[in-house]
């Protein structure tokens, strides 16, 4: 312990992971940060090992993945761990964001922490999309074609941008090389942003379920919260091992086990399940450009939440009306996820349009309206 406080580098680690004061009433909802850190470490390690055996070539990529599965010692374990942890990564991120929305973690003085978190989410989605293309199965090829073609909606320069991304006039060897290079390097940028996220959080410390200033009611990170984090980490590793060993493809898509064929279009082109809500928003708007704007806007709108939440009370713990609207929002997000996996035909198209309208209305109208109503009622009760 003396070394932790005397060494300049270890002293920094000590201030973040050992002696960091945390509110005494933190629930298990505050454990997602440590779970996400574990996921990021697993993804970087397994990704590095996979890159040692992967070949970024349109004629060899699919076979190199099969080589990893069949010939590399424990290659199946590395690949299935990488694929399934990606899904758990997004499960934990969505839960982490939901906790932030519910407990008002986006409000001052933690707005910077929230903003960095939103940037991390967007970067995660980009990395996930790049990785989905690398096995170069049917869904990889056609998913890359459809998603990159969205850039063609940009006026004047759209098609030029698409061809710049492709490195040619279609998804080709140059595209696969670019995607592999970016998929390898961007997780390290993600790790840097995660450190920045933690530094920003460390300035004012964690919030708590009551939304109040914890004051002196704090305990050191170690051993109390470290062991609390270990409970959920071991639970996660247990569930992950069940998926990897018994249901490795439960969260994937069967069409990606068919080699990419530009002459045959799959019956349904869908991204991975964790991108489906935003894919549903994209498809719910008939105009291509407006659909692309709405899809990116559905992520960027999280940045304006600190401005639109006008309530004087932090979080929804003591706000029954806002608590109800929050659960409506969660249901709406699940509906969008369901719609994103369906064909864009009636009645799914109409349901998707209603769900998309509610998604944006929640941020722009419902959150500020409920906040103003609660503030007004509080002022009336004071009279």
Curated annotation (Swiss-Prot):
Q: Superkingdom, according to UniProt? A: Eukaryota
Among the GO biological process terms of this entry, one is: mitochondrial electron transport, ubiquinol to cytochrome c
The UniProt annotation places heme b b562 binding at: 82, 183
Keyword Transcription regulation attributed: no
Recite the other comments.
Heme 1 (or BL or b562) is low-potential and absorbs at about 562 nm, and heme 2 (or BH or b566) is high-potential and absorbs at about 566 nm.
Topological category with respect to the lipid bilayer: Multi-pass membrane protein
- Can you name this protein? Cytochrome b
Free-text remark on how the cofactor is bound: Binds 2 heme b groups non-covalently.
């Amino acid at each position: 312990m003396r070394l932790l406080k005397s060494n300049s580098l270890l002293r920094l680690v000590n201030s973040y992971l050992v002696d960091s004061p945390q509110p005494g009433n933190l629930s298990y909802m505050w454990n997602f940060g440590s779970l996400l850190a574990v996921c990021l470490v697993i993804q970087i390690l397994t990704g590095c090992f996979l890159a040692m055996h992967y070949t970024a070539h349109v004629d060899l990529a699919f076979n190199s993945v099969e080589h990893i599965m069949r010939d590399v010692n424990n290659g199946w374990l590395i690949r299935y761990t990488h694929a399934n942890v990606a899904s758990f990564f997004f499960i934990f991120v969505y839960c982490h964001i939901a906790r932030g929305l519910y407990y008002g973690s986006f409000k001052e003085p933690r707005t910077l922490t929230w903003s960095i978190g939103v940037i991390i989410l967007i970067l995660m989605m980009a990395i996930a999309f790049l990785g989905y293309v690398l096995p170069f199965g049917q869904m990889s090829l056609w998913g890359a074609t459809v998603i990159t073609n969205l850039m063609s909606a940009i006026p004047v320069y759209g098609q030029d941008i698409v061809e710049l991304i492709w490195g040619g006039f279609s998804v080709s060897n140059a595209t696969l090389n670019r995607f592999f290079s970016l998929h390898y390097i961007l997780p390290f940028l993600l790790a840097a942003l995660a450190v920045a996220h933690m530094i920003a959080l460390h300035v004012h410390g964690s919030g708590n379920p009551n939304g109040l200033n914890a004051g002196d009611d704090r305990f050191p990170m170690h051993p109390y919260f470290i062991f609390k984090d270990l409970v959920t980490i071991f639970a996660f590793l247990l569930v992950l091992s069940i998926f990897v060993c018994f249901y490795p493809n439960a969260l994937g898509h069967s069409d990606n086990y068919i080699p990419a064929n530009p002459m045959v279009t799959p019956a349904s082109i869908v991204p991975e399940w964790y991108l489906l809500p935003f894919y549903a928003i994209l498809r719910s708007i008939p105009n291509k450009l407006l659909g692309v704007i709405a899809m990116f806007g559905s992520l960027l709108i999280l940045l304006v939440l600190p401005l639109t939440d006008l309530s004087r009370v932090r979080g929804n713990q003591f706000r029954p009306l806002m608590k109800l609207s929050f659960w409506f929002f969660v249901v709406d997000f699940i509906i969008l996820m369901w719609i994103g996996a369906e064909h864009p035909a009636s009645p799914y198209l109409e349901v998707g349009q209603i769900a998309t309208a509610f998604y944006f209305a929640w941020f722009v109208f419902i959150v500020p309206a409920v906040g103003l109503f609660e503030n007004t009622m509080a002022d009336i009760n004071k009279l």
